[in-house]
Amino acid sequence: LAPGGATATAWRMADEVWDAIDREAGTGVRLSAAEHFVTITDHELVTSRGIHARDVSTHLAVEIALIARAEAGSSDDEAETFRPVEARRLADLRLSAHVAEAATFARDTLRAEATPTHDGAVVIASGALPALFDPFLFHTGAQAAVMKLARFAPGDRVTDGGDPLHLASDSTRPFGLGSHAFDGDGVP
């Protein structure tokens, strides 16, 4: 967290969003709404066998809605885009980059047209990849396996053909959204 705690961190997040919006001035994009969330969690685990462990973690989330207009003052041609951003550290939020990308997306939406039928390679923007892989992350996780909901086991093929897709997860990665000293059951 920023010096000064959760409140100071929330203000720094808001300032970064406003600064990024100011850089979009004159492009037809404005901020419609923004919400900032700072959560500090302090877990303490004490067992009858003498184990005593503590895990203090942060979770930062920002939700940004931007509106692009084709012409200044006109509400006939508008496009809105919503961007949720989450991280454990302020530096990992990269709010300026997310605002710039969302502003570009909103402007591009104004010019978007239906594409002709296409047979070939498809390029997926970096922002779309997390949503694309969310089901794989769930089905390869230990929680889904224990709950008997996992579709995949180690070594299983994800697709019937084509190039293999190898998925790996590291819950010990520092400051990952799912990285903690121990889970809710006290397992390290």
What are these regions (language model features)?
Residues 1-180:
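Active-site bordering "gate/hinge" segments
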Residues 183-188:
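Short, intrinsically disordered, charge-balanced linker/junction segments flanking boundaries
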